[in-house]
């Protein structure tokens, strides 16, 4: 259950030796079947109704969540996943995004959310409403379909696509990950492919090549084809309705108490005593402060470990339509 990677300018052989001597050398490699099966495609969209808890005195009006969710390809299809990340921004999560704007204008919810998630074996694209009502479900679905059909028919705004690609390209070139160390982000990106194919850990680092290919496809109908295939003509879809339910927490707590009482009744007095003693020892361990000797084993930073130079922020000067 461990994935180890090294990042930086270092003596790799020395670091691997340290890993072996201090950590991994004490264990034997075992083969584990961590294969994850793909979920079979649905023959038709699946509708799911679930309850979620609200306070007993809280109003249930405009507290329903509605969502449409689409399974979109596979985790190792890197180009398609990057393309859907771009569509996420262009359609839903940028200023003036047509799908978001159409749903906001319909005034059927207090908030429009959603996006693309490629952190699983089968990535998903979701659109959901917060603060809505079940009676708006048909309108919700119709707005999604009508807006997407219009985007396919008229063509997605090429400048919007180009703009998002430029932003992604700039971030990758500059390794601009905010306050997060770039080595950490690179490692997390490796896992997007590495988790599902041990022979493909580096695919997500070829971002510039992928973005270059996607630039060429902006005016060739590629993005519109993705919308048609995965959002308009895709039966591997779920519609989820979350209903507010007053007092649900109390109901679930009572069910848990009944379950625990039944379990306790099935135990012998000796088994109960063991659980009580284990709990007592755990609480003692948690409440006992660490000794000075134990605290001294925690690695500490010195002033020499801190960088004296401040972060360098770069400004880019461009000219557009004669305006600098």
Regions found by a protein language model. Name each.
Residues 53-57, 291-323:
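Edge strands and adjacent loops of beta-rich recognition modules
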Residues 111, 323-324:
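Non-catalytic regulatory/linker segments of enzymes
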Residues 45-55, 172-176:
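Short, low-order "capping/linker" segments at domain edges
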Residues 1-42, 61-77, 83, 89-307:
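Charge-rich, well-structured scaffold segments of protease-associated domains
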